[in-house]
Design a protein with these regions (language model features):
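Structured adenosyl-cofactor binding patch, chiefly the S-adenosyl-L-methionine
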Residues: 201-244
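N-terminal positively charged helical leader segments and presequences
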Residues: 1-71
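Short, ordered loop/turn segments at secondary-structure junctions
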Residues: 11, 69, 110-113, 219
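Generic structural signal for residues in well-ordered beta-strands
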Residues: 40, 64, 146-150, 214
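Active-site/ligand-binding-proximal alpha/beta "capping" segment
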Residues: 165-204, 212-215
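RNA substrate-binding interface of SAM-dependent RNA methyltransferases
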Residues: 73-166
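Glycine/charged-rich beta-loop-alpha catalytic/anionic-binding loops adjacent to active sites
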Residues: 18-20, 76-80, 187-190, 209-217
Length: 244
């Protein structure tokens, strides 16, 4: 049986004890039904996995003793997805699935055709919601580092500030397939995916002026979340193959 993995936002030390309370306590007790003496792994976004066991259980907290720690190195290359905010569950699905695929960072965008209402969407609350999704997905997919979820910015600001070595914008009208552009690992890669209404011609042109390569994922018209998953999956395969 797989060990429980739990993210803890506090310092952890080998040989010490941790009291798991509040939401994490509820998750362990009610959802995972964790028991005394059960083995568990805690991580806190430092690269260390702390292997321990549940030493004591009360009605308010789990007391966990940390027995050993193991360090997992970060990849030397990074991948970022920049996506126009879309209707839920689209955005949530992108955060969840790309976290599982090992994405390093998310950059939410507002573009010309983004389905976005500032009066109805609390961006700070949305950011916190996405972080919770990424934590849950990191626990499930055995990541030791959480992805970075950046503050929402405009399409133009992103284009102006992007400094990745490889810069890709998905475009259904492009004659250039993604494998013709990205076929070997680079130090950093950013993938730009548009909203349900696509990017405007002006936005595609602006991205091209800043050295973004326009690529296609094939003949089919894909949903935003499908396109994001397909592109990042392909890049992950290319990057992973060069590790062998």
């Amino acid at each position: 049986m797989r060990l429980i993995r739990l993210y803890i936002d506090e310092p952890l030390n080998e040989g010490s004890k941790v009291l798991v309370k509040n939401d994490s306590f509820h998750y362990l007790a009610k959802v995972l039904k964790a028991k005394k003496n059960q083995k568990i792994i805690l991580f806190n976004n430092t690269g260390f996995d702390f292997h321990g066991h549940i030493k004591n259980v009360t009605d308010r907290y789990f007391e966990i003793h940390l027995d050993k720690r193991f360090f997992l190195e970060k990849n030397m290359y990074t991948t970022e997805i920049a996506f126009s905010i879309c209707k839920n569950p689209c955005s949530d699905f992108i955060i969840k699935k790309l976290t599982e695929l090992g994405i390093n960072s998310f950059q939410p965008l507002i573009s010309k055709f983004s389905i976005f209402n500032k009066k109805k969407i609390d961006l700070e609350k949305k950011l916190k919601h996405w972080k919770n999704i990424s934590i849950s997905s990191s626990e499930q997919s055995e990541r030791s580092y959480l992805p970075i979820i950046k503050n929402t910015i405009s399409f133009q600001d992103y284009i102006d500030s992007c400094s990745s070595v490889s810069k890709i914008i998905l475009n259904t009208k492009s004659q250039n397939m993604i494998n013709n552009v990205y076929n070997s690992r680079t130090e950093s890669c950013s993938v730009l995916v548009g909203p349900e209404g696509d990017f405007s011609d002006e936005e595609y042109s602006y991205a091209k002026q800043s050295d973004f390569s326009s690529v296609s994922l094939g003949d089919n018209i894909l949903r935003v979340e499908t396109a994001a998953i397909a592109a990042i999956s392909y890049i992950k395969i290319i990057n992973s193959n060069e590790n062998k």
